[in-house]
Amino acid sequence: MPASEDRRGKWKRKKRGGLSAARKPKQEEEDMEEEDEENNNNNNEEMDDVENADELQQNGGATPDPGLGIGEVVEDSGSRISDFPAVVKRVVIRPHASVMAVVAAERAGLIGETRGQGSLPALENISFGQLQALSTVPADSLDLERSDGSSSAYVISPPPIMDGEGVVKRFGDLVHVLPMHSDWFAPNTVDRLERQVVPQFFSGKSPNHTPESYMEFRNAIVSKYVENPEKTLTISDCQGLVDGVDIEDFARVFRFLDHWGIINYCATAQSHPGPLRDVSDVREDTNGEVNVPSAALTSIDSLIKFDKPNCRHKGGEVYSSLPSLDGDSPDLDIRIREHLCDSHCNHCSRPLPTVYFQSQKKGDILLCCDCFHHGRFVVGHSCLDFVRVDPMKFYGDQDGDNWTDQETLLLLEAVELYNENWVQIADHVGSKSKAQCILHFLRLPVEDGLLDNVEVSGVTNTENPTNGYDHKGTDSNGDLPGYSEQGSDTEIKLPFVKSPNPVMALVAFLASAVGPRVAASCAHESLSVLSEDDRMKSEGMQGKEASLLDGENQQQDGAHKTSSQNGAEAQTPLPQDKVMAAFRAGLSAAATKAKLFADHEEREIQRLSANIVNHQLKRMELKLKQFAEIETLLMKECEQVEKTRQRFSAERARMLSARFGSPGGISPQTNNLQGMSLSTGGNNINSLMHQQHQQQQASATSQPSIIPGFSNNPQVQAQMHFMARQQQQQQQQQQQQQQAFSFGPRLPLNAIQTNAGSTASPNVMFGNNQLNNPAAAGAASINQPSFSHPMVRSSTGSGSGSGLGLN
């Protein structure tokens, strides 16, 4: 007892420490209160539980977690291990308390303990509505190997079982009846469910496991069953059917086909074992009592094995009326529909009406008109994936081109009754649509074409003794009899001679090939030739009738004879020679008219050509006139440019003379030298400047003797400034007068520069050497113009030999 109490105390301390780290403060208070109650009231029961837990631990068991209210804790991040179904692998940090309780109960059951199993929770798979398998996994579990070496286990949900006659399909030349929920099966394709059963055939990792090999042995199994659908097919019957296939893969595919009813659906003796169970639902306790667990665990077989659908028709009833199942029987599908009450809608499972809609993606998916118009489509389909199918024309007329006599009579009768109401006409016909009725009515021949084949009896051919021509009808080819022999003798070959009506054929051809006026001329001339005899006969008959007006009896007899003769003449056809004469007259008239039109068109062409030439000449004249105007404007521009050039040259010479005379008092001789140097361009300016400098020094020495104190006189300086300004004004007036006159012959540049150099030196009036040097002053007076201003006069003390030249 002391050892058990010590063990119990350790367990209590361990329990308190674990709960304090896992629960919240509120939960800790509740647990402490529960522990106090257990310590006071249930000490003996706790000791028994601890002893039982110790025994389980010694036998390899695990202590159950007493905290049944603790939820499952997993990591937030995980790795995706399957794309379909979407599976994410997460690490479980703490499993759910119910899971631990179930595991503890299973382990307790292994050692013979059954206490506490009645209160175990029932775990249900919410995804598929089945009991979750926890401990038992069969050897052939559906594992899909991943590229990274991992595997993902997933479960295929059972299909909803649909009762009915089944779906009839063609398996080659044989008939294959499938359940309603197995309508996805097709011999030439592989469905998603099949890829989940044997994924190794579609991974591409092994050369022996390919989709083609899977379809080969799958179709071999189905073909083996279809050969004798009344017999239940087993795996032993299919041994040696296909070589090179693993027995496990073969067995798995066989069980899959059997589960879905693709095989053994119409077999008479079906043996479908239920889900395998290792332990019976009824169990016996150690005390000898028998009990039934409330939530017995099931294996994973319950998720892939389900109740087998039952076919209402036996195999003998379906296939007994088909002695030879070959593709040559045209009414094979019709007889199958008669036995199986036609197909059913894949949405509402009702029998299909006469008109239904078929899927283009999968030809076995059918919809009735109500489901299609209300948008109740199969998953993965839309209205664009379905086409309208009419079984009335499925095996016969596809486009409605084949009409029977009865349908044609109904169409004509409906047209008479309902006029242009084609909806009622189509309803009256019954087997054709509105568009087909309209198309067939337009294709019907008119009455004239129908009357061509009618044979009229009692018509005799008469001969005309006057011209010896046999008046017979046309032959089958439309040729005129009697003309072939005559035409062979004639040398003239005329067109359309073999047509039934050569004249009208010629007129029609001319109307389509040439102008309408030419064709009208041809027709008019032909008719005039044909009606010439008629006019002559009518004039003769009018004369005879006038002579018979003498007696009443004779008049009545003549009128009677005239009417009889007119009737006889109206019935007699035209002679062949008259037809050919009209033919030739029409051709000649057409040729003449065409020649006149051709001449007129030629004259019109000549007139238009002359107009074109005249317009081209006028166009050239206008261009030449524009060129003359452009040349005149160009000459004016050239004159303006020449004036501008001369003005720039004068300005340049004046600027150069002003620059060289600016140091003070350059004589006119210096200006003349500068003008000569600029005009010739060959003299040296430096030598001239040196000579001028020497002359200035020589004049400076003789200046006081000539006009003493002149340079210091302010009155003389003022007069010299005024004279310089007046000289500039006169030069500007001369330049304006030269620009006003028209240009004459072009002057050389040296003459322009010489005149400018001799007259454009305003600083010559300020040179003291000219005032003191008579020779220099005389030379300057020769080149400079005279000034006639009244205020300008000679200074006092200056003689006539001063040389200023001022008046």
Swiss-Prot record:
Zn(2+) binds at residues 345, 348, 368, 371. PROSITE patterns: SANT, SWIRM, ZF_ZZ_2. One of its GO terms (biological process) is chromatin remodeling. Expressed in roots, stems, leaves, flowers and siliques. Residues 28-54 have a biased composition (Acidic residues). It comes from the Eukaryota. The keyword Transcription applies. Residues 692-703, 726-739 have a biased composition (Low complexity). Residues 598-656 form a coiled coil. Keywords: Activator, Chromatin regulator, Coiled coil, Developmental protein, DNA-binding, Metal-binding, Nucleus, Transcription, Transcription regulation, Zinc, Zinc-finger. It is found in: Nucleus. Residues 798-807 have a biased composition (Gly residues). Residues 1-74, 458-487, 549-571, 692-713, 721-740, 781-807 are annotated as: Disordered. A zinc finger (ZZ-type) spans 340-394. Disruption phenotype: Plants are viable but have alterations in leaf, root and flower development, and are early flowering. Residues 458-467, 552-569 have a biased composition (Polar residues). GO terms for molecular function: DNA binding; zinc ion binding. Residues 398-449 form the SANT domain. Residues 176-274 form the SWIRM domain. One of its GO terms (cellular component) is SWI/SNF complex. PANTHER family: SWI/SNF COMPLEX-RELATED, SWI_SNF COMPLEX SUBUNIT SWI3C. Heterodimer. Interacts with SWI3A, SWI3B and BRM, but not with BSH. Interacts with MORC6 and SUVH9. Component of a multiprotein complex equivalent of the SWI/SNF complex, an ATP-dependent chromatin-remodeling complex, which is required for the positive and negative regulation of gene expression of a large number of genes. It changes chromatin structure by altering DNA-histone contacts within a nucleosome, leading eventually to a change in nucleosome position, thus facilitating or repressing binding of gene-specific transcription factors. This is SWI/SNF complex subunit SWI3C. It comes from Arabidopsis thaliana. The lineage of its organism: Eukaryota, Viridiplantae, Streptophyta, Embryophyta, Tracheophyta.
